[in-house]
Amino acid sequence: MDAAGRGCHLLPLPAARGPARAPAAAAAAAASPPGPCSGAACAPSAAAGAGAMNPSSSAGEEKGATGGSSSSGSGAGSCCLGAEGGADPRGAGSAAAAGAAALDEPAAAGQKEKDEALEEKLRNLTFRKQVSYRKAISRAGLQHLAPAHPLSLPVANGPAKEPRATLDWSENAVNGEHLWLETNVSGDLCYLGEENCQVRFAKSALRRKCAVCKIVVHTACIEQLEKINFRCKPTFREGGSRSPRENFVRHHWVHRRRQEGKCKQCGKGFQQKFSFHSKEIVAISCSWCKQAFHNKVTCFMLHHIEEPCSLGAHAAVIVPPTWIIKVKKPQNSLKASNRKKKRTSFKRKASKRGMEQENKGRPFVIKPISSPLMKPLLVFVNPKSGGNQGTKVLQMFMWYLNPRQVFDLSQEGPKDALELYRKVPNLRILACGGDGTVGWILSILDELQLSPQPPVGVLPLGTGNDLARTLNWGGGYTDEPVSKILCQVEDGTVVQLDRWNLHVERNPDLPPEELEDGVCKLPLNVFNNYFSLGFDAHVTLEFHESREANPEKFNSRFRNKMFYAGAAFSDFLQRSSRDLSKHVKVVCDGTDLTPKIQELKFQCIVFLNIPRYCAGTMPWGNPGDHHDFEPQRHDDGYIEVIGFTMASLAALQVGGHGERLHQCREVMLLTYKSIPMQVDGEPCRLAPAMIRISLRNQANMVQKSKRRTSMPLLNDPQSVPDRLRIRVNKISLQDYEGFHYDKEKLREASIPLGILVVRGDCDLETCRMYIDRLQEDLQSVSSGSQRVHYQDHETSFPRALSAQRLSPRWCFLDATSADRFYRIDRSQEHLHFVMEISQDEIFILDPDMVVSQPAGTPPGMPDLVVEQASGISDWWNPALRKRMLSDSGLGMIAPYYEDSDLKDLSHSRVLQSPVSSEDHAILQAVIAGDLMKLIESYKNGGSLLIQGPDHCSLLHYAAKTGNGEIVKYILDHGPSELLDMADSETGETALHKAACQRNRAVCQLLVDAGASLRKTDSKGKTPQERAQQAGDPDLAAYLESRQNYKVIGHEDLETAV
């Protein structure tokens, strides 16, 4: 098969040190060849692949497999080459002969030497037995798994090849070529390992990182990496092959010394001590689907090598390498050249010549396979937008997608890429840059006249981004995970955007000699956002002219903003635009607006297509009950005409709006002097002219949906929980910057702020208001004499309350991603639901927070609200408290207080064995299903935080027995930690137990109480999957419908490296 189908590449491991290293080495040998290979051809090389792990002990024993299979492969990537011989079959034979000689030599030695040889043989036999036992993994047998001996490597002739940093689209493109980027990472070891690293003793050697498969090597080791034939994941397939085309992609396995997430097979994490400098291979992951497995025989198995890759959570938007074909250059054979040529007509010659010109310089073609589930995505990134953001975004998209669907606009325009992909069905486009980048792509789409036109989404970089704000993409990219962005583009709604023509002619009312200095045409003849003239265009023009004259003075965004402010103030004092109304004539759909413009003396006139203008302001506002005007839309075929005075321009920044003049389909504008104008932010000074504005067409755009389409409908009473009980934790900027790639450490460093109970469909904008109210309650509580009551504790404790409030700059953090925490832009909070970023707790980042305690040792947080010391609060009654929360939709339970006397009371409670007779009575009552005995024992002082002989909680027992009344009593009176507490042996929660027993009533009680539907047991199974295994598809469907949102990571376990 071709290289696009098979990509299993693992790094060479160090030689095994004795028999104890054999299992790890054999486990790491799980790979398939990078070149043409079949399953049958891989099988004979089992021993060769395993023996390569320890050449010192198995070179002689494995000579048959190594030497015999060296000629069965073909091409540079053949899987059957010898471990020591490389591409030369003689190398394998030499190594085999040397090993055989090493076994025969002790025959002529003394008895002591014979004993040593016998002992050595026994060690070798032991290793061979282990290798044979692990044949399921080692049979893949990649030749590059073996550490190549420096003396056996061929010497390269000629100068060293420069590492490639960009994709090669020429006919010389090599499949599986790495894209090397300079990196300064110091924690990652060289991918070759200590045995093969060329500069392993140099601490400051230059390193490079592949943007596609994320491996890091020294610059001096790149040549060695090529010699062992370690390839990157394939991005295309070779054309001209007579073999049947495979419509699937195989995994591209890569060794990882550091790995986030959990193993796909066993569900356990990749935990290791001192992981930052670890030299051990802990995981094997696929750089396509991001699945990861432990480097163990029991986790990574043979069928993983041969099975097709699903391409992971983003398979619907990834362009498979099997679609992209490199066409071989046709060569005229001798037989064809001697054949008599037929005469062709001039028309046919011209047609053929035109086709050759069209295909000239295009060695690649796209042959897609149509599917209604596929929405292939093209990503265009402008690295110059947003400082250094564009470059980082470009690299992240190359990691998640096929690099040949990600394009750098600084290298080449979008035309060639759009032409290449023009026949791909359901195509979508993501423009990463400013509004100018979006306009550029839309203009090319107009030029190519694609039908149907692919919709365009926007990832805003830089400042401004009014179109991105209109389409709900926000005002700028913060650090939202690229995985979520891909989901949003895939699930986004396709809407239309009006686009308007600007037709410019010289003013016919003025003689040629009266035309003043100025350009005769606008910088753009089409606009998507706005077209304006007057004050705002004059300020923008001054900035552009000054930057062109002195570009070195405008290399700072802060300086640019200061210059804008200074230019605006200077223009305001000079009143250069005060006479604008005297030199223009505006006619909208036959209505002359000139008298009104002259009456109100506007200094700025804006023709607005979208609601946003000037970095997010809304100049049209909300007409409300004004019957003359309609609310503004970007797809209604009308353009809004707005006038501004200096006062209304100033009010615009604080929520004001301009003077609404008209909503029309056509505008005729005449100017009688040179006036500054701007088209979508591109300024000029236009000579007196007649400008006609008319509707051009409508472009398809991707609007970011407020929720994923895969989420349950909000109006479905069975799909969204009535309320969510969520703990709020705050994190300092210092901890966030230090631990944002280590979720566990960051969780430990967070400080609990309090607990909210909100509606199930609450969004973050509303949740922000509740958190601010929580702060107010905290301050009011701190002013009085209070006592804090802890659940399951009869005593109350006086407390000194924390007076540190949240700063106004705090923001939400998304903790649902597999690799790290991400900040959420405040302007996009209304687009996110609480349950989209929360797994029973919310994290917020406070940049002004002062850390008052060491990270990782947060004290306990009370579960109940603070009550007055003089009496008992109604909140102490669990049933009444539950009813109050459900009625209000919001409850504040227990703000967090700091006290050194209570740091031993952890909010993460630990179960204890029964110590009193009441505890034993409670345990027996729950197991027997005796509710009355349970109530009596609990009133007599028994604890609900006890465990049975098998380390299960009371809620586990109640869920297993299926007694709904006991489950309800424990939920009402027990601590909240019991709800999602996992069994120490199986990792199952109470919901897992109930699902295994197919007890629907208990499952409903637990789900209504807020039990997590996404927690997995030790085998990686959710309660829904347990119900499916138990043979209750109705219960499984119910649990699936009640899930808060679709989990991206558990199916494919996206893992960061």
From Swiss-Prot:
Protein name: Diacylglycerol kinase iota
Domain of life: Eukaryota
Stored Pfam families: Ank_2 (PF12796), C1_1 (PF00130), DAGK_acc (PF00609), DAGK_cat (PF00781), DGKI (PF23578)
Keyword Plastid attributed: no
PANTHER family: DIACYLGLYCEROL KINASE (PTHR11255), DIACYLGLYCEROL KINASE IOTA (PTHR11255:SF92)
Name of encoding gene: DGKI
Entry's Gene Ontology BP terms: diacylglycerol metabolic process; intracellular signal transduction; lipid phosphorylation; phosphatidic acid biosynthetic process; phospholipase C-activating G protein-coupled receptor signaling pathway; platelet activation
Any one GO molecular-function label of the UniProt entry: ATP binding
